[in-house]
Amino acid sequence: MQRSRASSTSSGRHPAPPPIGLPQPQAQPLEAPKIIVIHPGSQHLRIGRAADLNPLTLLHAVAYRRRPGASDRPHHDPLLPPLDNVNSNSGLMVEFEEQRLVVSRILQHCVVDNKNRLRVATPPQQLAHFNRSSQAEKVPAPSGQMADEPWLDREAPVLFDDRILRLGAVDARNYDIHFPIQRGELNVHNEKGGSLQASMQHLERIWSYALEERLKIPLRKLGTHCAVLVVNDVYVRRHLREFVTLLLRRLGFRRCFLVQDSVASTFGAGIGYGCVVDIGAQKTSIACIEDGISQLDARVRLSYGGGDLDQVLLLLLRKCGFPYRECNVQESYVDAHLLDELKEKFCHLNASVCGAQEKHFNLRKHNGQWLRYTIQVGDEALMAPLALFHTELLNITGRTKAVFTQQAVQDQYDCEDCFDAEYLKETGRKNGVRGGDILQLSTSAGYQPRPQLPVTADDEELIVVDQDETISNCQSQLGAQTAGGQMNSNGCYHNGQGLVLPLDQAIIQSINRLSSYETKRKMFGSILLVGSSAKLPGLAAWLEQRISQQVQSEVNVLIKGMDAGMVAWKGAAIMSVLESARELWISQNDWQRHGLRVLRERSPFLW
């Protein structure tokens, strides 16, 4: 039912009527200025009206000022993935240097023009000689920075957006800094502010700031607005429930609906099908979309992204004498943001660019003085993004990178879902019809129960216990099968050494999990690159060449002319005003009366 309904929605055909018992969505005029599209990410939040040309992009973090004299340690969620015990004597650094040499030798065999001339690389020692002698020079403040404007409001109880990026190592000690989403999912942990409800509170503070201060929409008027939330393809059902509660009850939107980011990306790019590769700040997700449906078996989220490339770039720059020697991305948000900017300015995947390139960057010191640094960069600008294809370089941010595929329904226990498998097990009667129904379901799943004997009044308690054991054994077997399937599903995205697969091989593995040869061929011919870290020059051509060398199908890697990080947001804005999307909206009254049932029935993806 879900698949046919969602397919008809995406293709523009007349949508199927809602299930009996749920109210028909009211046919109200769609006003794009009254629709707020929200795309939350690990590092950035993109939010804006559906009628806007581009969304606002904010840092998706909040900093709470600590009480004076607080004895506990401040909590700092890092802007960049932390290094995994990296020092000059560690085995990780030895591995990193070995892999750097491997990548360097590969680049030496690249042809730079039609005359078959090979690249000539500048050794790091030569670059270090220049960079170590480079001195910073004083420069005036940027034109956008007023001379009398305070750099940091030290009295503000809460900081948002770029104010957090102005916190150096010393100033950051006065704040608890939280990123509510990390590695593509809610940042739930055992430290301060790490509970699920605390994470939702952080989201509420950030989104309220964006709505009131940046979009100039008073919170009391959100009852006249609607919201579209872009969520991950690999999702946790309980988290989606909390998101809807946040939008409808806590923020007070009139109605909302959810859409998966890869599906929204196909709408934003104007394609009907394709393999969507979303390279974000802290994760890379792959999903195959056909007729507006994200194929369940082909979804995967890999725990590496642009932030990991930042750390690789920093180690490479330090090897060639990085002139800003005090750079401390672990404690200073100023330095972490600087490194992210250097990746965007320096890095590329164009093998024809070789030799030393002179670059500049500006930095504000604690005393308010702006400095200009000059640095020479060679193949370091090319090696850092190549870590997407040589994941051994990414071991510096954790040797074991998590891989997430969509969990089965029975693995996502939710006590508020009346159709949850565990809920049905615990609330079903121990004898009579329901016990037999559960056994019948178990039989259809492949379990053969023992023959039933006639039940007498004296034997009822005995049979009840026997049924409990039978059901428990059956579900244990099914749970083991599900866990094994989940493990096998994740294991196919690791190589023989247990390392997560490179980007090109992960895409091939994801597409090959599809059952139809024709569908596979279509996906290889339409690979869409999106995400904030997919804007590296030359990435699409490099990825296309790598995949073409490993498959026989025609390979086309697409990247649209717009900002790759905004494609999903634009697609969600387009979906929100479509006539066929009317049945997707969930109102406050629907959510209050029906809860998860209405989300299950109206979500445009398989629940």
From Swiss-Prot:
Intracellular or extracellular location(s): Nucleus; Cytoplasm, Cytoskeleton
Point to the regions of Polar residues compositional bias: 1-12
Q: Which residues carry this modification: Phosphoserine?
A: 11
For the keyword Nucleus, the answer is yes
GO molecular function term, any single one: ATP binding
The chain residues annotated with the modification Phosphothreonine are 9
Q: Does the keyword Methyltransferase apply?
A: no
Tell me the keywords, alphabetical order.
Answer: ATP-binding, Cytoplasm, Cytoskeleton, DNA damage, DNA recombination, DNA repair, Nucleotide-binding, Nucleus, Phosphoprotein, Transcription, Transcription regulation
Which residues are recorded as binding ATP?
A: 278-281
InterPro entries, alphabetized? Actin, ATPase_NBD
GO CC aspect terms = cytoplasm; cytoskeleton; Ino80 complex; nucleus
GO BP annotation list: chromatin remodeling; DNA recombination; double-strand break repair; regulation of DNA-templated transcription
Family listed: Belongs to the actin family. ARP8 subfamily.
* SUBUNIT field: Component of the chromatin remodeling Ino80 complex. Exists as monomers and dimers, but the dimer is most probably the biologically relevant form required for stable interactions with histones that exploits the twofold symmetry of the nucleosome core.
> In its UniProt entry, what is this protein called?
Actin-related protein 8
